Amino acid sequence: PKTVRRQRQMCIRDSLNSIHFGSPSNKKTKSLLRGVVQGIGGYGNCIGVPTIAGQTSFDESYNGNILVNAMTLGLVKKDKIFYSKAAGLNKPVIYVGSKTGRDGIHGASMASAKFDDKIEEKKPTVQVGDPFTEKLLLEACLELMRDDSIIAIQDMGAAGLTSSSVEMASKGKLGIELHLDKVPCREENMSPYEIMLSESQERMLIVLENGKEKKAKEIFDKWNLDFSVIGKTTNSKNIELYFEKNKVANIPIDLLSEEAPEYDRKWKKSKLPQKIKFTKKDFKNLKITDVLKKILASPNVCSKEWIWEQYDHTVMGDTIQKPGGDAGVVRVHGSEKAIAATVDSSASYCYAHPLSGGKQIVCETWRNLICVGAEPIAITNCLNFGNPEKPENMGEFVECVEGLNEASKYLNFPVVSGNVSFYNETKDKGIKPTPTIGGVGLIKNYKDMITMDLKETGNIILVVGKTEGHLDQSIFAKEVLNEKKGPPPEILSLIHI
């Protein structure tokens, strides 16, 4: 008999993360690092999704704002893809998953807010996750997806019910009517405002075909999850909100989506820094063994095994290249194919010259996939920047995006998704520009996978490409010579784009 996994139309395969912390000497870094690693490991391990790759970096610019970027990779049959575009009139709008609480209210705005000494007061805006409920919700949704019940489905992420309902209606050029007193709540006396903006985790919004409510409810009841018909689609092109029979809001959908105001920020073009003129005197008193030890001891170079060993990277039994290599690799169950995935970023390159830095990250992602024998397919991104109201920060954003665009076009490496996080600053001091790139590649036969470990004595070692001796922005320059200035290395193939 076939296994349950093979019967599924889709499944979550793997997760990756890119986490950035302040200087190791900062008093909060150790506890923040431990907490983040425990959170990623605890949630991922409980839900049964392997964490196959990631990166960890340290820089004083993150002393006030750490970054936790996560990427999840799924597998789906191409003719069984579900979308978030609502369609049809008077279709039932269904709330499923956990109950709504006050946790996470204003969480999205906090993620793009400047921090000050009162940051501890924002703890109530942090969502409380429950991996066991998430696992139940995942299984229930997959079960419902086995027939033709679902018209549209979307998770309640940033801004909760507000974003999911507005986005689904906007994509379908429809209106939506919601009765908020029908939303399952775990706290008493929640206002319509709180219900709409709550970011409580483990919740989904579904538009169903008429007549499918009973069957769908039976599925979610079986998994011990909340199920409630909270509204319907309309032709009003408005979002209409009711609470205890009173209309509390009636807003045109387009004003919240396609016709929302767009900022035209002023931005400042960056200048390529001058190369540092290193001389023989800089290296005269250096011993190669001491240099090597210092580089290997750097927090940004040393082994991160103690971190990723806390993650379950083999659950599901398909991981064939664990963390620590150029990319994680998992086989596609029931076939000879394998999927490679990696996450990369380089804040120092982007800070030195955003345009060049943006190109560098895309190329590094490409190289990492190639190095495990994969054919690069596509990338996603998480663009982390400071205050866009400052022309220099907005300039970093503009030029990094231009660099990402140029490199992805040159490599035929399409960007298929992504998000942006602004206002990452504390006490008016922002982070270095940190675009994080996630890349996916395909290995047609997993037996052709390549690993980075040396195989046997006598193997030939080759250097591919021209070595220019570029030291600016290198770990050597920073850790040994204490020199942090200079431009990032050029990408020769992209110079004339």
What are these regions (language model features)?
Residues 13-66, 118-120, 355-425:
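A glycine-rich phosphate/pyrophosphate-binding beta-strand-loop-alpha-helix module
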Residues 20-200, 429-436, 442-443:
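Hydrophobic, small-residue-rich alpha-helical packing segments that form membrane-like cores
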Residues 18, 53-62, 156-165, 182-188, ...:
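A glycine-rich phosphate-binding loop feature that marks nucleotide/adenosyl-phosphate handling sites
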Residues 1-8, 12, 495-496:
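Single conserved hydrophobic/aromatic residue that forms the stacking wall/gate
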Residues 13, 47-55, 148-156, 177-180, ...:
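Flexible, glycine/charged-enriched surface loops at secondary-structure junctions
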Residues 198-209:
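Short cationic amphipathic helices and targeting signals
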Residues 86, 92-93, 98-138, 144, ...:
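Intein/HINT protein-splicing elements and their conserved insertion hotspots or analogous self-processing inserts
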